[in-house]
UniProtKB/Swiss-Prot annotation:
Recorded topology in the membrane: Peripheral membrane protein
Function: Involved in the synthesis of Nod factor, a sulfated N-acyl-beta-1,4-tetrasaccharide of N-acetylglucosamine which initiates a series of events in the host plant species leading eventually to nodulation.
Identification of the protein by name: N-acetylglucosaminyltransferase
Gene Ontology MF annotations: hyaluronan synthase activity
Keyword field contains Electron transport: no
EC number, UniProt record: 2.4.1.-
Length: 424
């Protein structure tokens, strides 16, 4: 047996053992009830909080934006609700103007128009104009069920909770084989990974398309959130994970509400999907380092979660790489590696199909091939290019002052404001 074959067998065997422990614990905790640190009677007697919804948009499809705002207008919420739409220097600004006209008589809606693209973190600075107890961030390509605000706000009535997210689905699931695969990927990410983390009040990333934050907590973290640097350069993506980790660092709980359903548009071509995954991989690697000091204060499961995701990825990559080397040099297939990966894929897909009560999850086996031959090399590239903050889907954004700071002026208007920046 060659050194390559031995290494491949050892790596995949360690990967199998680690993944078995990690995934078993994940499924076990995902099925259990979240522990609340506040007595239920105290939560129920808290007043219904006011909610401000912030919708940052950039070059959004007019139909998609219209559907997003319509879903917000139809929210069934007993408390006060305001909606702030922030156009981040879109080239198709007519789409936003049309929506402004459509909701001109709805006092809940406020439209802010930025003259140039400044990035999502700066667009979310509309929080400084708002006054709600809670802030709900909704991406402009996302529609939410009528009860989402109510369900997330109910979870946030526990003062120990700083952030909460809903369950993500693909609104364009039926378009291509890739969108179907991504929809299943979202289900697993929400109902296994996030659900298990929420068991201990420590969801590590509240997904941006539908995430609610406590305004008082967010204001105290806003400067850190807006000015995140990596190796001396502004970090312009991964804002969801970064803000969540800041919440955990400040001592707040972060939660997952599976019954709060949000549907978002997902990539329907492989090129767009891989560019998205590259951005996410870079931000995940960056913020994993930021999260390390937080882990000792959380339940031990969260340490296992970090090890399972990162060390597991390294072991799988090593086994695949040495297996390919074995085949290239000796013309013999790494049968043990293939058998272990195939068996683990079958078990995982079967468990998902059983838990979701949907046979389509058996087809998620295709994701294993995508992961091995596309995502692992992409993540290796991301690890080697962590300093690159290019969005890949658009040009670099300008860094501008926060709304309301010196250098920003607000034009008169009841439901519309236009912010002009003096700096680059």
């Amino acid at each position: 047996m060659t050194l390559l074959a031995t290494t491949s067998i050892a790596a995949i065997s360690l990967y199998a053992m680690l993944s078995t422990v990690y995934k078993s614990a994940q499924v076990f905790h995902a099925r259990r009830t979240t522990i609340s640190t506040t007595p239920a009677k105290d939560i129920e007697t808290n007043p219904v909080p006011s909610v401000d919804v912030i919708v940052p948009c950039f070059n959004e499809d007019p139909i998609v934006l219209s559907e997003c705002l319509a879903s917000l207008a139809e929210q069934d919420y007993a408390g006060k609700l305001r909606i702030y739409v922030v156009d981040d220097g879109s080239k198709n600004r007519d789409a936003v103007v049309a929506q402004r006209a459509a909701y001109a008589d709805d006092e809940r809606f406020n439209f802010t128009i930025l003259p140039k693209n400044v990035g999502k973190r700066k667009a979310i600075a509309a929080i400084t104009q708002s006054s709600g107890d809670l802030i709900l961030n909704v991406d402009s390509d996302t529609t939410i069920a009528p009860d989402v605000v109510s369900k997330l706000a109910h979870k946030m009535r526990d003062p120990a909770v700083g952030a909460a997210m809903g369950q993500m689905k693909a609104s364009n699931q039926a378009d291509t084989w890739l969108t179907r695969l991504i929809d299943m990927e979202y289900w697993l990410a929400c109902n296994e990974e996030r659900a298990a983390q929420a068991r201990f009040g420590a969801v590590m990333c509240c997904c941006g398309p539908c995430a609610m934050y406590r305004r008082s907590a967010m204001l105290s973290l806003l400067d850190q959130y807006e000015t995140q640097l990596y190796r001396g350069k502004p970090s312009d993506f991964g804002e969801d994970r970064h803000l969540t980790i800041l919440m955990l660092s400040a001592g707040f709980r972060t939660e997952y509400v599976p019954s709060a359903i949000a549907a978002t548009v997902v990539p329907d071509t492989m090129g767009v999907y891989l560019r998205q995954q590259l951005r996410w991989a870079r931000s995940t690697f960056r913020d994993t380092l930021l999260a390390l000091p937080v882990l000792p204060g959380l339940d031990r499961y969260l340490t296992l979660d970090a090890i399972g995701q990162n060390v597991g990825l390294l072991l799988l990559a090593l086994s695949v790489l040495t297996g390919i080397g074995q085949f290239a040099l000796t013309a013999t297939l790494p049968w043990w590696t293939i058998l272990v990966i195939g068996s683990m894929t079958l078990v995982r897909c079967s468990v998902a199909a059983y838990r979701a009560r949907e046979l389509r999850f058996l087809g998620f086996a295709l994701h294993t091939l995508v992961n091995i031959f596309l995502l692992i090399p992409l993540k290796a590239y991301a690890l080697c290019t962590l300093s690159n903050s290019d969005w890949l889907s658009r040009g670099s954004v300008a860094i501008a002052p926060t709304v309301g700071q010196q250098g920003a002026t607000k034009m008169p208007g009841r439901a519309t404001s236009e912010i002009a920046y003096s700096g680059e």
